[in-house]
Amino acid sequence: MEALRESIKRPAPTARIRRIPASGNTALAASALIQAALGIEFLLSGLNKFADPNFIRNFTLFVDGSPGTQTGILAPLIHSLVLPNIAFFATLTKYIEVGLGIVLLLGAVEVGRRRFSGALGREHGYEAPVALVAALAGLAAAGLSLTIALLMGEQLPTIQPGRALTTAIPVELLLVPLGIAVAWMEAGRFRVLRRVR
């Protein structure tokens, strides 16, 4: 009986536990690549808008000529809010896209950095907030892409002979699940990193 009490009182030996299984490491590295591509898309798209000296005029023509402005679920909002303030929304779009691109790229670099061992992959206190901001950026990227797709009158992908030599899924619609996937992954990282602190 005394031996049993002794074994209960003694702490269990500590074992070194790996941070993440190899499959999770690979999945996070792959998701960082997707996140980086999404970040580059938004960063370059925003910078292209800054480089266009006639962007406000071109944005106005784009919104006016889009099918979603005439019909669709966004038409009332576009007519009551966007068109009367077109210069504001054109400028806002430029800054939002550049901001999303930067945040998504920084988040991807951070996810990639953590895949390394040693000093480079060491945990830092800023990781949870970075993951949270990157998750919000992923959601914003998905929302912005969906808004553009609805504005353009994009439809769900189907078999169409006219799209034989182009992408089957319009790029704007393809960016929506990618943004959601990034948000999901980064939100998961945030939950784990927040608990670790």
Where are each of the predicted segments found?
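Extended, low-polarity transmembrane helix blocks
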Residues: 2-197
